[in-house]
């Protein structure tokens, strides 16, 4: 049984590595949602994956009304010290995953969460509901500073680089 699971896992790996090279052809015939669902992902209503990538769709549970930004990655596996770590990733309802973000295995994201663009959510992290994940921490939405302060902080960070 273990060898069958490994073979299936390798099939997924090859599929996801090669698929982008042929995506222009397949995109005419196969939308991303049915493709991910076909491979075992559980995806809620009104969820848009678009150009986001689900590695290990069999280890993916996504709630309703979620949105993935361009090239966002949700992965159910990671290699650590030569060992393969596999765990299911769960996203609640009304979750927005920013462009170029990476979500690693074992992550559980609550409802009404925004994961900022270019963010990484480390493995086994739990993000509470009604928060924004940015710079490695979850900020409750009620504690968020006004938009002009956020814009100023972003400009300051850009100037410092």
Language-model segments: what does each one mean?
Residues 1-37, 139-161:
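Terminal amphipathic alpha-helical/low-complexity segments used for targeting or macromolecular assembly
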Residues 17-90, 94, 100-107, 124-125:
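Left-handed beta-helix
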Residues 70-71, 75-161:
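Glycine-rich hexapeptide-repeat left-handed beta-helix
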């Amino acid at each position: 049984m273990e060898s069958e699971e490994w073979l299936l896992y390798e099939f997924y790996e090859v599929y996801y590595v090669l698929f982008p090279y042929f995506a222009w052809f397949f995109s005419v015939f196969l939308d991303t949602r049915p493709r991910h669902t076909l491979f075992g992902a559980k995806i809620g209503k009104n969820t848009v994956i678009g150009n986001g990538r689900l590695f290990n769709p069999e280890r993916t549970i996504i709630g309703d009304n979620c949105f993935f930004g361009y090239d966002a990655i949700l992965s159910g596996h990671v290699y650590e010290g030569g060992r393969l770590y596999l765990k299911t990733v769960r996203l609640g309802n009304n979750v927005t995953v920013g462009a170029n973000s990476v979500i690693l295995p074992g992550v559980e994201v609550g409802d009404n969460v925004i994961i900022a663009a270019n963010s990484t959510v480390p493995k086994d992290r739990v993000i509470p509901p009604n928060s924004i994940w940015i710079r490695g921490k979850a900020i409750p939405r009620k504690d968020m500073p006004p938009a002009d302060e956020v814009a100023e902080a972003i400009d300051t960070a850009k100037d410092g680089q």
